[in-house]
């Protein structure tokens, strides 16, 4: 079973409280999502492998540690997931970025995939799927399904807020993946929104309705 972790660092929790506020501007919302994603990246990347390397300091030659060169991929779920990419990418600039686009069918209310653009060697990469919200779990499950169909096996799901219903649904569908969030909220309301949540992350990121 993959792990589920709430990253409760004080800086993350402080910024998340501002992010939730109804009066937070689009500009500030965008910057906060970027900052929280970067801070979460510290914990999400904790198990990246290291290797020893000999370097020359101004004083002496020494053996130190660096990332082993394991291939990474950041895969945001469009469109809101885009807001998390740059923050995480600033920590691992060599990572490739793929995209999975979805829309919600108005009749079935289920997510429908309309775009998949991934690195050719996605099956060889450690993948970080990003979406600010894990609500019903439908989009997350479809995204992981899509990645696994293409041979991906090492997948982590990273979100800012999650509903218990969505976490359970994703764990039931894909018990092997790790899930990271900055907050496990109370529940979903009758419209499928996370409570207390932060509203529609895509609209708030891009200033749309």
UniProtKB/Swiss-Prot annotation:
Key words, A-Z: Allosteric enzyme, Glycosyltransferase, GTP-binding, Magnesium, Nucleotide-binding, Transferase
Entries under SUPFAM superfamilies matching the protein: PRTase-like (SSF53271)
Cofactor: Mg(2+)
InterPro entries cross-referenced by the UniProt entry: PRibTrfase_dom, PRTase-like, Upp_B, UPRTase/APRTase, Ura_phspho_trans
Statement: the UniProt record of this protein carries the keyword Transferase: yes
Pathway(s) per entry: Pyrimidine metabolism; UMP biosynthesis via salvage pathway; UMP from uracil: step 1/1
Activity regulation, free text: Allosterically activated by GTP.
Entry keyword annotation includes Ion transport: no
GO molecular function terms listed in the Swiss-Prot or TrEMBL record: GTP binding; magnesium ion binding; uracil phosphoribosyltransferase activity
Gene3D superfamilies for the chain: 3.40.50.2020
Residue positions binding 5-phospho-alpha-D-ribose 1-diphosphate: 79, 104, 131-139, 200
A biological-process GO annotation: uracil salvage
Chain sites annotated for binding uracil: 194, 199-201
A Pfam cross-reference name: UPRTase
CDD domains cross-referenced by the UniProt entry: PRTases_typeI (cd06223)
Cofactor, how bound (note): Binds 1 Mg(2+) ion per subunit. The magnesium is bound as Mg-PRPP.
Protein family: Belongs to the UPRTase family.
Cited function: Catalyzes the conversion of uracil and 5-phospho-alpha-D-ribose 1-diphosphate (PRPP) to UMP and diphosphate.
Protein's recorded name: Uracil phosphoribosyltransferase
Source organism of the structure: Streptococcus thermophilus (strain ATCC BAA-250 / LMG 18311)
This protein's encoding gene: upp
């Amino acid at each position: 079973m993959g792990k589920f972790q709430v990253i409760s660092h004080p800086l993350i929790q402080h910024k998340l409280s501002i992010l939730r506020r109804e009066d937070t501007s689009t500009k500030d919302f965008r910057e906060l999502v970027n900052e929280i994603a970067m801070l979460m990246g510290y914990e999400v990347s904790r198990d990246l492998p290291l290797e020893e390397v000999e370097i020359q300091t101004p004083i002496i030659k020494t053996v130190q540690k660096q990332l082993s060169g394991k291939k990474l991929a950041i895969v945001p779920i469009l469109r809101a997931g885009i807001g998390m990419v740059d923050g995480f990418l600033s920590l691992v600039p060599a990572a490739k970025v793929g995209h999975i686009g979805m829309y919600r069918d108005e009749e079935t209310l289920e997510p429908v995939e309309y775009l998949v653009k991934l690195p050719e060697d996605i099956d060889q990469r450690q993948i970080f799927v990003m979406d600010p919200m894990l609500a019903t779990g439908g989009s997350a499950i479809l995204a992981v399904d899509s990645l696994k169909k293409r041979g991906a096996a090492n997948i982590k799901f990273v979100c800012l807020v999650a509903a218990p219903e969505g976490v359970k649904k994703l764990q039931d569908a894909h018990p092997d993946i790790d899930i990271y969030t900055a907050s496990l909220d109370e529940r979903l309301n009758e419209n499928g929104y996370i409570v207390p949540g932060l509203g529609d992350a895509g609209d708030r990121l891009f200033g749309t309705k």
